[in-house]
Amino acid sequence: MRKVAIYGKGGIGKSTTTQNTVAGLAEMGKKIMVIGCDPKADSTRLLLGGLQQKTVLDTLREEGEEVELEDIIKDGYRNTRCTESGGPEPGVGCAGRGIITSVNLLEQLGAFDDEWDLDYVFYDVLGDVVCGGFAMPIRDGKAEEIYIVCSGEMMAMYAANNICKGILKYADTGGVRLGGLICNSRNVDNERQMIEELAKKIGTQMIHFVPRNNFVQRAEINRKTVIEYDPTHEQADEYRALAQKINDNKMFVIPKPLEIEELEALLIEFGIAN
């Protein structure tokens, strides 16, 4: 079973990219579990046809310790197993702590047991690695390969570099490795070349360049992944290509994060800071 975590700046399109990629893998016949590690609980919505499923933390609050696996896992597109960790009430408690509670509960209830015959577990993790709780999939060895969703925008690249610092910190203890950068295009000038160069400097690869296409939003409005909404669309093939590249990937590295000056020099070189 491969344990994958998707990180990236808030709003970069992590959940959309994760769900569309998972749909591509499911189409290949892979058995997958998706764990949403975001208080917004929107990491599985497209796989479930828009169903806002009850989160692990909400279920725990309402039912106490009497929680069964079927209470917190729903079957989505092509039998993907979907669960959302959820978060505390706004202004109360720690969302990162909630992720730890949720994943530990899933383990206790046997969500990852051999009987499920899983090929992949995907963790869709909120935003930047800003606290220990959100770093938990990296830190505790829950995830073994990380993909960072980014774009040619400065803050997305800054966040990607920060996440690499988190991976570096826990690479020895958790055994986690970086599998590559996924460029979710924002149509920035020289974007593909810039992210390829960033990947090279960090010591990794740009595993796929996902072109910007408004059809993704159209599929989302219809509460579906692109592959489910229109399997013949060119954007569906982009996500299939990304899924295939992740499935075939053999390049797993300990990243070499850049200094902020190096990052700014890269932005200047490709004309974005001019």
UniProtKB/Swiss-Prot annotation:
Binding site for ATP: G8, K9, G10, G11, I12, G13, K14, S15
Family: Belongs to the NifH/BchL/ChlL family.
Record carries keyword Oxidoreductase: yes
Residues annotated as binding [4Fe-4S] cluster: C94, C131
Residues the record lists as ADP-ribosylarginine modifications: R97
Source taxon at top rank: Bacteria
Cofactor note: Binds 1 [4Fe-4S] cluster per dimer.
GO process annotations (BP): nitrogen fixation
EC number: 1.18.6.1
Catalysed reactions listed for this entry: N2 + 8 reduced [2Fe-2S]-[ferredoxin] + 16 ATP + 16 H2O = H2 + 8 oxidized [2Fe-2S]-[ferredoxin] + 2 NH4(+) + 16 ADP + 16 phosphate + 6 H(+)
Official protein name in the record: Nitrogenase iron protein
Subunit record text: Homodimer.
Mod. after translation: The reversible ADP-ribosylation of Arg-97 inactivates the nitrogenase reductase and regulates nitrogenase activity.
UniProt-recorded Gene Ontology molecular function terms: 4 iron, 4 sulfur cluster binding; ATP binding; metal ion binding; nitrogenase activity
PANTHER family for the chain: LIGHT-INDEPENDENT PROTOCHLOROPHYLLIDE REDUCTASE IRON-SULFUR ATP-BINDING PROTEIN (PTHR42864:SF2)
Cofactor(s) needed for function: [4Fe-4S] cluster
Listed Pfam families: Fer4_NifH (PF00142)
Cited InterPro entries: NifH/chlL_CS, NifH/frxC, Nitrogenase_Fe_NifH, P-loop_NTPase
Job of this protein: The key enzymatic reactions in nitrogen fixation are catalyzed by the nitrogenase complex, which has 2 components: the iron protein and the molybdenum-iron protein.
